[in-house]
Amino acid sequence: SPDKGLTWMTIDTGYPGSLWSGIKADVGIYLLLGMSGNIIIAKELDPNAEEPSADKFTGLGCFEGGMYDGDCKVFTFEYQNIGVKNSLTNAIILDDGRIAISGNSGTVSIVDLYNKKNIETCVRSDRLSNTSIVNLGNDEFLIAGQKGVRKHSMSQCYENFVSDDPALQDSYYTVDLS
């Protein structure tokens, strides 16, 4: 909504599942967070300058009333999965443009649309559901949810994943977006 919620448009994303949250990632780029680890990358197109990609679902939405009545937007939707089947609950934009996402069953993901063009996902060994995430800097976060607030480090999760110590049970996944 461009007018702080006074008017809305409904757009068919083509996604059959539930969406739990969303975030504006950049000008004309939005991430929609869904169930089972699914992310929809929605890109707003300028219909006078860009042709929609044939391999992506395209949606059209128009405002119906208010000061934007009749204003229409064209979006393409790219479906991605973070590498695991855990629902996603919250997202924040980091200082460098990446997106940090919290999710159920210990999931923390970092989406990099521009540099690495990937999604890195940690599934914490505690498997506690996370409902929100706060950036502490240096790839460290506060995650809140089941059983309170915890500090999380993506680099520590990766070190735990590659460790030979059987007591460390974190999992780490990388999905290529290019």
Region spans (language model):
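Residue-level hotspots at or immediately adjacent to binding/recognition sites across diverse folds
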Residues: 1-178
